Structures are given as C-alpha cells and as structure tokens.
Swiss-Prot record:
Signal peptide: none annotated. Belongs to the PsbE/PsbF family. GO terms for molecular function: electron transfer activity; heme binding; iron ion binding. One of its GO terms (biological process) is photosynthetic electron transport chain. This b-type cytochrome is tightly associated with the reaction center of photosystem II (PSII). PSII is a light-driven water:plastoquinone oxidoreductase that uses light energy to abstract electrons from H(2)O, generating O(2) and a proton gradient subsequently used for ATP formation. It consists of a core antenna complex that captures photons, and an electron transfer chain that converts photonic excitation into a charge separation. This is Cytochrome b559 subunit beta. The keyword Transmembrane applies. Its cofactor is heme b. Its main location: membrane. The chain crosses the membrane at residues 19-35. Pfam families: Cytochrom_B559. GO terms for cellular component: photosystem II reaction center; plasma membrane-derived thylakoid membrane. It comes from Microcystis aeruginosa (strain NIES-843 / IAM M-2473).
Length: 44
C-alpha cells in the first residue's frame, strides 16, 4: 500500500499481526471513549 508493488502481495505477512495489534488497542479505546462520552450526558 505504501510501496506501489502489486506483483508481490507476499511482502505483507506482517499485515495480519499489525491489524491484530491495532484493533486490540483501537476497539477498547473507541468503546471507552464512547462510554465516557455517554457518561457526560447522564444526569442523575
């Protein structure tokens, strides 16, 4: 994607590990930001 070389898709074995590492951090982060943002609007 960064280097325009469509003949070698095999040069991305790290893509799955990188996707997994990004999403294991990004998914709970988005969840907690959404939960904290929702708590701002809850009046007791």
């Amino acid at each position: 994607m960064a280097s325009g070389n469509p003949n070698q898709p095999i040069s991305y074995p790290i893509f799955t590990v990188r996707w997994l590492a990004v999403h294991t951090l990004a998914v709970p982060t988005v969840f907690f930001i959404g939960a904290i943002a929702a708590m701002q609007f809850i009046q007791r």
